[in-house]
């Protein structure tokens, strides 16, 4: 592998990395579709026409069950927590990274939002992509089936396993690791 920890964020994105934030910021005046056009153009170094991009975004929105006007809203402005997370998954779908880090994507979601986000990520999952899903709860893993589960304490892996480890954590908690 190649150490990219010192690379600027835009270079990491060009290499195929994506980070879904726990608390995505809002950017007034920038529409989702414009942000996606700029990001995709920079990552792929290809200029998309507005029509090409709108078709690509519309396809992803349909796949994720988002309304047609969603892409014309300002980036996370006035969004509920669930809408912010859905927007992150839309970005994930359109930008199509090789590796996605989903940092507590289930944080603040109600049952319906959790289902939309979980199923959205699950639909995007393929064998040639990697997903690092950070969560404290089993409920997200009912939709996103992990290949591996790791428990981190102070930045180090202290136990690894399969889905059964997440089920154990749901029942017993993290106390034995602290």
Feature locations, PLM:
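ABC ATPase NBD Q-loop/coupling interface
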Residues: 1-12, 76
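Catalytic "switch" loops of ABC-type ATPases
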Residues: 22-27, 136-137
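Walker B catalytic motif
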Residues: 104-105, 112
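Helical segment within the ABC ATPase nucleotide-binding domain
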Residues: 114-127
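Conserved H-loop
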Residues: 128-136
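Conserved beta-strand-loop-alpha-helix hinge in the C-terminal portion
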Residues: 143, 148, 152, 156-178
